[in-house]
Amino acid sequence: MMRTVYLLSIIFLAACSHKIVAERTTYFPKRIETMSNSIKKENVWVFIMAGQSNMAGRGVVEPEDTVSDKRILSINKDGEIIIAKEPLHFYEPERTGLDCGLSFAKTLIKKIPDSISILIIPTAVGGSSIRQWLGDSVYRNVKLFSNFLSKVEIAKQNGIIKGILWHQGESDANEKDIPLHKQRLHLLFSKFRAAVGNNELPVLLGELGSFSENPVNFNLINNTIHEYAVEDKNSRVISTKDLKDKGDHLHFNSKGQRTMGKRFANAYLSMH
């Protein structure tokens, strides 16, 4: 009897898991479109997405997120240039969802010359700490800084790197790491800019969400983000105070991701 109940429980859990995966991936792209013709490098603006899960994206891809634009590009896991379709990140296929990248590009492309295409390069890995980025740690099978460097090379081969979108800090929201966070931001972004070869490269930082079950520490991380931006004239912080979570008190929902993308774009435009 107990064995039967145990087997039925396993079958039920497997069915539930399959249903959750099916719902999460319903509107994922059915095919990947690679670029059939090359674009002049000087006509491609490249933005690199970096950080942890709220940059990698945990929102649900919905029908409105499936509309692509041939001027908005990304890469696949083999480093090939493709037409950008959500989800853009591919490092954690069992977790990946809607991020802010396509929303960012769609907002930006309305405000720049028609001759310009946008290439969004994903490098964010959920759960990664800034210390792991600085130490080039292997996290979830990704060597964080080395992977960033390899994507910078792809970016340089195909366009002009115009900025970095950064959202990270949840993994650093603890008593040990909070006092070091601002200093680590300075160190990491200096390394990012050195890799790109532009000491004035714009870096756009997103606040942590206001829906955490650990609000005190999240607020302290946000304070360090704002303090950093005061010291770096080539950075901007986007507010997320009004954005909602997906029900887990940790990750932005789909609407929040789209809004965040728009705010990143407007922050970038405000610098030019």
Where are these regions (language model features)?
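Initiator methionine at the very start of the polypeptide chain
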Residues: 1-2, 112
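Short secondary-structure subsegments characteristic of cysteine-rich extracellular domains
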Residues: 9-10, 181
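Cell-envelope and extracellular/periplasmic
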Residues: 19-272
